UniProtKB/Swiss-Prot annotation:
Assembly notes: Oligomer with a subunit composition of (alpha,beta,gamma)6.
Keywords for the protein's UniProt record, in alphabetical order: Cytoplasm, Lyase, Transferase
Annotated organism of origin: Haemophilus influenzae (strain ATCC 51907 / DSM 11121 / KW20 / Rd)
Reactions this protein catalyses: citrate = oxaloacetate + acetate; citrate + acetyl-CoA = (3S)-citryl-CoA + acetate
Superkingdom, taxonomy of origin: Bacteria
Record carries keyword Lyase: yes
Record protein name field: Citrate lyase alpha chain
Pfam families with a match to the protein in the record: CitF (PF04223)
Function: Represents a citrate:acetyl-ACP transferase.
Localization: Cytoplasm
EC number(s) recorded for this UniProt protein: 4.1.3.6, 2.8.3.10
GO biological process: acetyl-CoA metabolic process
Length: 500
């Protein structure tokens, strides 16, 4: 009878041959605490980070995020250079990145948006290479296509177990959905969790799973959840924004798409988020129930869900603490990843099931192109977000915006920067009137049967200019500071350095 060794030697198909390993050695390699790091510095060292690599972050804590600055400051202190920073978005509190750019720590950026001092400095030429501005769905497309290769993802979570199972809706600092982080956890070469506390294994429900996580480090705080629902995601009390929201609700009622089983999303911005307030009464009166609401979920949507008026909530990002807590207790409040939410090249994105999306704008022009990125001075002060993803996919895309802001017109002849192309925008609702894209005669016909006064967008532009005067053209240099990527990865516009 032959031995096992003889049988293997006779035929092993050119595969490696088993080598015995003492069990003590196997157990050492698979120690239960092997992922735990005693400090952030240890986690960075063990991640294998090297100069020239790409580090990524999520922005579920929005204005309350602590992780980006904490990690980037430590990375800079450790002497790393020439890194690509790929955060799902960057906001005002990330101003320390300015120094990291000046010192050569960060030389390239991918982000959905920029705000505050960081945006101001980049708009004035701080970064040698233009920032890649992508949509939320577009980011996933760039990651999956291989253009945006994430070497190390640093993901903040309120709590997890010591093996890496985590979600964003348990623990002290609840941020809600980890929809953006889930993409990084799946595609990054190395995943480092930063957590405030540990819970018993196995932690459940699971948003980020143990088989995706390499290293874990406990820190004092990953974010301030009280600052999630501020800025662009605040709930407005502004009378003008509420007027626009009420007008938008009337347009929705008359559109032909407001019927039992409809679906909707509201984008960021006071008026857009406020629309849900004005839907409830009509839904109750006409016994209409929405099948689902999508996107950034708010307290207003949770209230409609718990009242039985919206059957399901699909949550890629929780816009306030009420939404974060709802995710934990309501079984039909469902977390979705950014891939499931809006990726152009996924096998099925939830945006493709939308009937209506209500979105804000910094500018909209007479061709219905929308700018949500640069201000009237040409400085970056916003984010692409899911704007172009949802506008392209929803049956009806509605823009809500004031006709003018102070002495600045919102409706203009040409937007400074195009993020969402006009062919995907259907209706504009302002405090001075409503305009429907001529390419949607069905909507023009439906709204013409109501007492809603309709204008051409050219008429609204003229009215805006009669109030503010025609804006002066901004002077730019020839240096590009950002390229705006459409959801399929193509370049839809380029932002140039503002001339001082």
């Amino acid at each position: 009878m032959t031995t096992r060794e003889q049988r293997i030697e006779k035929y092993h198909a050119d595969r490696s041959v088993y080598q015995a390993v003492p069990k003590s050695e196997s157990l050492s390699r698979t120690a239960k605490d092997r992922k735990l790091c005693t400090s952030l510095e240890e986690a960075i060292k063990r991640s294998g980070l090297k100069d020239g690599m790409t580090v990524s972050f999520h922005h579920a804590f929005r204005g309350g995020d602590f992780v980006v600055n904490m990690v980037m400051n430590k990375i800079a202190e450790m002497g790393f250079k020439n890194l690509t920073l790929a955060s799902s978005s960057l906001i005002d509190s990330h101003f320390p990145i300015v120094e990291h750019i000046k010192n050569g720590v960060v030389t390239k950026i991918y982000s959905s948006g920029l705000r505050g001092e960081l945006a101001e400095q980049i708009s004035r030429g701080l970064l040698n290479e233009p920032v890649n501005i992508h949509s939320h769905g577009g980011r996933v497309h760039l990651v999956k296509s291989g253009e945006l290769k994430i070497d190390v993802a640093f993901l903040g979570v309120p709590c997890c177990d010591t093996f890496g199972n985590a979600n964003g809706f348990t623990g002290k600092s609840k941020c809600g959905s980890l929809g953006y982080a889930r993409v990084d956890a799946e595609y990054a070469d190395k995943v480092v969790l930063l957590t405030e506390e540990f819970v018993e294994y196995p932690h459940h429900p699971i948003s980020i799973a143990q088989d995706q996580v390499d290293l874990i480090v406990q820190v004092e705080a990953v974010g301030d959840p009280k600052k999630i629902g501020g800025g662009a995601t605040r709930m407005t009390t502004n009378p003008r924004e509420l007027l626009i929201a009420r007008k938008c609700a009337e347009v929705i009622f008359a559109s032909g798409y407001f019927k039992d089983g409809f679906s909707l999303q509201t984008g960021s911005g006071g008026a857009a988020l406020a629309v849900t307030r004005f839907l409830e009464e009509k839904m109750r009166r006409e016994n209409i129930t929405a099948d689902f609401a999508l996107g950034g979920i708010t307290a207003s949507m949770v209230a409609l869900h718990e009242a039985g008026l919206i059957k399901k909530l699909l949550d890629v990002q929780s816009f306030d603490s009420v939404a974060a807590e709802s995710l934990a207790r309501n079984p039909n409040h469902i977390e979705v990843s950014a891939n499931q939410y809006a990726n152009y090249s996924s096998k099925g994105a939830s945006v493709e099931r939308l009937d209506m999306v209500i979105l804000s704008a910094l500018e909209i022009d007479t061709k219905f192109n929308v700018n949500v990125l640069t201000g009237s001075d040409g400085v970056i002060r916003g984010a692409s977000g899911g704007h172009c993803d949802t506008a392209a996919s929803a049956q009806v895309a509605i823009i809500v915006a004031p006709l003018v802001r102070g002495r600045i017109p919102t409706v203009v002849e040409n937007v400074i920067t195009c993020v969402t192309p006009g062919e995907n925008v259907d209706i504009l609702v302002t405090d001075h009137g409503v305009a429907v894209n001529p390419k949607r005669p069905d909507l023009i016909e439906a709204l013409s049967k109501t007492d809603i006064p309709l204008f051409t967008i050219e008429q609204l532009c003229e009215r805006a200019y009669s109030i503010t005067g025609k804006p002066k053209e901004i002077e730019f240099t020839n240096k590009p500071v950002a390229v705006v990527r459409y959801r399929d990865g193509s370049v839809i516009d380029t932002v140039y350095q503002v001339k001082d």
